Curated annotation (Swiss-Prot):
Protein name: Ribose 1,5-bisphosphate phosphokinase PhnN
Listed InterPro entries: GK/Ca_channel_bsu (IPR008145), P-loop_NTPase (IPR027417), PhnN (IPR012699)
UniProt superkingdom: Bacteria
HAMAP family hit by this protein: PhnN
Organism per entry: Chromobacterium violaceum (strain ATCC 12472 / DSM 30191 / JCM 1249 / CCUG 213 / NBRC 12614 / NCIMB 9131 / NCTC 9757 / MK)
Biological process annotations from GO: 5-phosphoribose 1-diphosphate biosynthetic process; organic phosphonate metabolic process
Function as written in the Swiss-Prot or TrEMBL entry: Catalyzes the phosphorylation of ribose 1,5-bisphosphate to 5-phospho-D-ribosyl alpha-1-diphosphate (PRPP).
Pathway(s) of this molecule: Metabolic intermediate biosynthesis; 5-phospho-alpha-D-ribose 1-diphosphate biosynthesis; 5-phospho-alpha-D-ribose 1-diphosphate from D-ribose 5-phosphate (route II): step 3/3
Residues that coordinate or bind ATP: G13, P14, S15, G16, A17, G18, K19, D20
Family: Belongs to the ribose 1,5-bisphosphokinase family.
EC main group: transferase
Length: 185
C-alpha cells in the first residue's frame, strides 16, 4: 500500500473541445507512473474518437450489477463506466487521468476525494467545425451539442484550457498541469 493516494485528474468539457487528442498527446509524453483510464462505453470500438473498451448494453449492465465500475454515467444514449482498477491505481499512489462527464462531476467528487477537475473547451466556432469534421453526428445532433456546450460553465474557480490553436500549445499546458500536480481549481 502506498503512503500517499494518487490524484485523479478529471478531464471534462464539451464535445469537440479536443479532449481525446489532448489526452493522447499527454499519454505519449508522461511517465508510466501516470495511468490513463480507459472508459467502458456502449459504443462500437470502431466508432472513432478515444480508445475505449466497447461493451454491449447487456454486458455493461452485467458489469455494473457485478460491481466492476467505480463510476457510471449515461449521456447521449450511451452508458459510460470507469473500472474499479481506477481505485486500485489511486490506492497505490499513482496519478490517474480520466475523461469524465461534466454532469457527473459531483458524483465523481464524492467518490474520489483526491479529484482535481480540468476544464477543456474551445470557442463555439471551433467546436462547430470539429463536430462537423468528425462526422459522428448529424446536423441536428451537432446543434444540440453546441447548445449544450453553451449551457455548461466550468466549476467555480476552475482554470480553463481553451483549445482553439495548435495541439502542442494546449497539450503542453495540460502536461504542465499534470506534471506539476498543482491544484487548478
Amino acid at each position: 500500500m502506498a503512503d500517499k493516494t494518487g490524484t485523479l485528474w478529471y478531464v471534462m468539457g464539451p464535445s469537440g473541445a479536443g479532449k481525446d487528442s489532448l489526452l493522447a498527446y499527454a499519454r505519449q509524453r508522461l511517465p508510466g507512473g501516470v495511468m490513463f483510464a480507459h472508459r467502458y462505453i456502449t459504443r462500437p470500438a470502431d466508432a472513432g474518437g478515444e480508445n475505449h473498451v466497447a461493451l454491449s448494453r447487456e454486458e455493461f449492465d452485467a458489469r455494473e450489477a457485478g460491481g466492476c465500475f467505480a463510476l457510471v454515467w449515461r449521456r447521449h444514449g450511451l452508458a459510460y463506466g470507469l473500472g474499479v482498477e481506477t481505485e486500485l491505481w489511486l490506492g497505490q499512489g499513482m496519478d490517474v487521468v480520466v475523461n469524465g462527464s461534466r454532469s457527473s462531476l459531483p458524483l465523481a467528487m464524492a467518490r474520489f476525494p483526491t479529484l482535481r477537475p480540468l476544464w477543456i473547451t474551445a470557442s463555439p466556432e471551433v467546436l462547430a467545425v470539429r463536430l462537423r469534421q468528425r462526422a459522428r453526428e448529424c446536423g441536428e445532433v451537432i446543434e444540440r451539442r453546441l447548445a449544450e456546450a453553451a449551457s455548461f460553465a466550468p466549476p467555480a474557480g476552475c482554470e480553463v484550457l481553451v483549445n482553439d490553436g495548435a495541439l502542442a500549445q494546449a497539450g503542453d499546458t495540460l502536461l504542465r498541469w499534470l506534471r506539476g500536480g498543482r491544484r487548478v481549481c
